[in-house]
Amino acid sequence: MIKELKKNIKFAWKYSKEEKWKLILLVLCTFFHVIISVVAPLVSAQVIVKLSNNQLKQVFYLAIALFAINIGSNIINYLCGYFSQVIYRETFTKLQLDLGKTILRLRNSCIDANSSGVFIERLTGDTSKIADVFNIINYHLLDILTDIGIFGAVFIIDIRIFAYLILMVLIIGFLERRKINVVTEKDKVLRKENENVSGFIGELVRGVRDIKMLSAERSFLTTLRTRLISLNKKRYDMSRTQRDYQLIIGSLHDVFDLIIIVLMLYLISNNELSIALALVVHNYMGRASYAVNSYSHLLEQLKNFNLSANRIFEIIYSSEFPKEKFGKHHLDSVEGNFEFRKVSFGYNEEELVLKDLSFIVNSQSTIAFVGKSGVGKTTIFNLLCKMYEPSNGKILIDGIDIMELDRESIRDNITIISQNPYIFNVSIRDNLKMVKDDVTDEEIVEACRIACLDDFIASLPSGYDTVVGEGGISLSGGQRQRLAIARALVQKTKIILFDEATSALDNITQTKIQQAIDNMKEDYTILIIAHRLSTIINSDRILFLSDGHVIADGTHEELLKICPEYRKLYEAEIEK
């Protein structure tokens, strides 16, 4: 555990080292607090002794001293709390940002394989425990140093009482250690269960509309009830274990307190211990009897800290959470040419979606992909954006292998407008600024005009400052897609991918969007996935996909002649 703890504290220090002077001041405050904790009972005992001897003048001076000690203790407690909060806040913020950045760099296959709860719990709960480690150590260091001072004072007063306290510490320490080991194992299971429940609740909240429309409330609530019962059962099991040990240990404390009182009475009756020193020991006993708790709680929290650190290490360093890999080649400008050269890919090893797929796209051209669902149209877009990596073959942008290009050369030059675009829970203006923070109001207005969104925005009381809700919940499907199109126009990337982006639009708006796409042809390389063939008949080329291959490539008129599958789809659409 020591080796693991050393590694984890070194990791936490990376995020706390800028607050090192506050940490030093916190340790100094702790040191003074220890002195006060040891001295205060001595002064209190003297007050009682002097009062019993009617030495009122000395009592007055001692009372003033005790008052000053208490004031000093309050000030030091305040400073300790202040420094602790600053250190925690700064460490927590930096750690969360760093972990958030790491999560954004994970491969999509890793995101797909884990529930959102895995990342939410670690990003919130585990980071909090790591950020608080130095405050925990300092807090318990205060207790431990105070206990050492108290035990030293008791040793000077009477070695027999000291020996008794050591025996008491060993017995309670053994029980505390057993409790920590049992609770830590149960906590591992509880955290995993909590991740599963958090992920399911996230799905429930995001899919609440579909759940209502499908009348699936009962099924979801039944599943939620089952998972919550399982979680609460594990939570209760861990809590019961803690209570059982607390009952045993608390009862032992009471027995030990009774024994120490009997022991002191015996020593006083034999004139081997003065009443004044007995009062001092009694004042110390409240701390001394629970001395082992400080060490045990420190050990328990450090084990929790190690557990949280290891869970975060899994995301940052473990091969179980693979990161996206980019090359070092940077393109200052992208023309928009790209090529798929014998590319194969599957979301799992058993089944390939694309099989030796090859095609070339020239810059400033409009290419459409057509085919049945599941033939790999969206997969082509995902591979081009490097959301996934091909199993075999190469993807080239302007003649450079995508594996050699850096992140900016790919992601800053390709925009995908999906069938269900995610709209952030901010204003319309801020949604557009997400992709380009220095965008001007004129650019925003122009992008919304091209995307046929300007009339709708003008009808809103707050206009561009209207907050659209999580996922754009206050917008219709068509409005969300048009906002996504405006967002792509603001970004001004050279390659724009439309993945069924006009599927939720009415015919009038679809015509306007089609005109907007036609206006963009001279400046952009445009790729379109569409089931409505009427939206892509003016494309420069149409690629018909089947079973992971391109089986036909040409204009609309050419495909009607050479591709029976395309002709059949087009005739079926005309009949509708």
PLM segments and residue spans:
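Short intracellular "coupling" helices and adjacent cytoplasmic loop segments at the cytosolic face
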Residues: 2, 83, 89, 97-121, ...
